[in-house]
């Protein structure tokens, strides 16, 4: 995983954007997930807690108005592009990017051809916000993975830890249009 870094002290990241100097006051170690834009310039960082910190993720933008899409600098837009929520999940799929959250609008506004995009949201059928975003994404006629009922794990990372063949599950459960709507109705729990 050559896309990840480690820092001993979270307060070191303030040098990337002085706006955060008053909000980051702790000194704990963090896993650093860097975000680069399409021009391969650093656009932000997500720092993940390693010891069960109350604030699990701290995201820092270099420029306030720049979108953070992990992996956008490495993706081949002429092939299927898998769009997941978290940077760590994206490391388990070839040609994937991460939204740094659940908003799909970032990717909808990107330069990736619509037919090449496959949204792979977390498996949280009881999360109303997520369910609404999955519904909106289906209504916008994108390819969406609808997890089968047999999958109980929340995200790709958990599935990999459970020895689930994630690529096979995604391949067999990617839907669009009316079929996606039908599978979505079966999947959601709110």
Q: What is each residue range found by the language model?
A:
Residues 43, 55, 78-81, 87-190:
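TOPRIM fold recognition
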Residues 2-116, 130:
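Phosphate-handling DNA/RNA-contact segment within nucleic-acid enzymes
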